[in-house]
Amino acid sequence: MNFNSFRKEIYSGNASVKELVNEFFLKIDSLNPKINAYTCLTKKIANSQSENIDKLITNNQKLPSLAGIPIAIKDNICTKGVVTSCSSKMLKDFVSPYESSASGKLWSLGGICLGKTNLDEFAMGSSTETSVFGTTSNPWDVNRVPGGSSGGSAASVAAGLCLAAIGSDTGGSIRQPASFCGVVGLKPTYGRVSRWGLIAFASSLDQIGPITNTVSDAAEILYSISGKDNLDSTCLDKPVPNYLSDLDKSIKGIKIGIIEECFDHPGLDPEVKESVLSSVERFRSLGAEIHDIKCPRFNDGIATYYVIAPCEASANLARYDGVKYGYRSEGESNLLEMICKSRAEGFGDEVQRRILIGTYALSAGYSDAYYKKAQRVRTLIRSDFDNAFNEVDVLLTPTCPTTAFLKGDFVNDPLSMYLSDLLTVPVNLAGLPAISIPCGFDKKGLPIGLQLIGNVLEEHRILNVANIFEKDAEVMNTKPNIEI
């Protein structure tokens, strides 16, 4: 179901918004024990919001743009009066005293908050297996991961447990789970959406964005949460276009660049490659011009990212010491011992690993060899993208090298896990917008996603190209069969 079909249910008058929203809660109560997409539900908040919309309908008043739309929020985005845990023992009982800018905009436009969704601890992971609440299951095969770190958000949309979910994307954390779960995931330009209220992982890379069933729904959510915010100094003061207005525009003559380095990589699954290249031919038949493009440093992105992101994480997570808030170890004899034990017990293995990597890379005598060098390579990666966009309008790659893998496959092999982000991290390093859309299935029936990358602030262009593909491809209408 998309937004427009849900609106028809509202306008039909056969059921109130509150009744329609409660149907989602009934489905969540039935399916969440199997999928583990939600960490907590906000039924009281949702009922209050629903009643407000029903009053507007009763009084024949104009409805706000997202009136009645059931939305889930990733649990690293602050929601006032609700636990915001980052799926970590460190913040398991932390109740946010304020609302994030992005979620606040959604509620002001009539959106309904269903609850918070599961993620890899502090958004560090590609499988949602590092959560203190347990692993989320992929709705297409509950023995497989949904991707990460926004695995709960993607799984909730794919399973029909909400109509849209908000995630965060630091190195692919919206797009990769969207690909694994067969839904649409959009990472906006860095600064397009305010990060106020997003608990920081890597501040120069983090970006909030939507996960939805359709491209048009993603466009609507993006329009709703974008724009200048004085509470976030990195938020861009640029006009926000109506992303819905150009969705159906013909893509005849648009230049799509195929990044050669992505398709030549030995880690790319042949079935994924075949499906994405088949989609390239579909774009050609729709009138797009296809060009081969070289981005020589694209595959250096993964190594660059796994220096820069842990460095920023080690600084951002230094605040969690058990003194002011967060998990606190009891019975220690002095302050230093209490801080050390609180962090050792409060953070999971993957978070501790990245803190150690980041602290080492920033330490005296090593920052030149690692952090500063990685920042120079980051500049070169951005330069490659600039050169590519001098030749084409949009870039195309697979979203992920593989389809969803089995739970436990890479828990003890972090380097292999990191490679799941191979094709997404360069986009974050360059601060560009990108969208993942379903393009096919492998022989196991698992979704395959393709990634469209745009130039800075050209979300409207990738949304247009994605929407035309969506309307032409029947794969978008296929949903997982989850037994209640």
UniProtKB/Swiss-Prot annotation:
Annotated active site: K74 (charge relay system), S149 (charge relay system), S173 (acyl-ester intermediate)
GO BP terms in the entry: translation
GO molecular function: ATP binding; glutaminyl-tRNA synthase (glutamine-hydrolyzing) activity
Superkingdom of the source species: Bacteria
Catalytic activity: L-glutamyl-tRNA(Gln) + L-glutamine + ATP + H2O = L-glutaminyl-tRNA(Gln) + L-glutamate + ADP + phosphate + H(+)
SUPFAM superfamilies linked to this entry: Amidase signature (AS) enzymes
GO terms for cellular component: glutamyl-tRNA(Gln) amidotransferase complex
Keywords: ATP-binding, Ligase, Nucleotide-binding, Protein biosynthesis
Family: Belongs to the amidase family. GatA subfamily.
Family annotation (HAMAP family): GatA
Protein name: Glutamyl-tRNA(Gln) amidotransferase subunit A
Organism of origin: Prochlorococcus marinus subsp. pastoris (strain CCMP1986 / NIES-2087 / MED4)
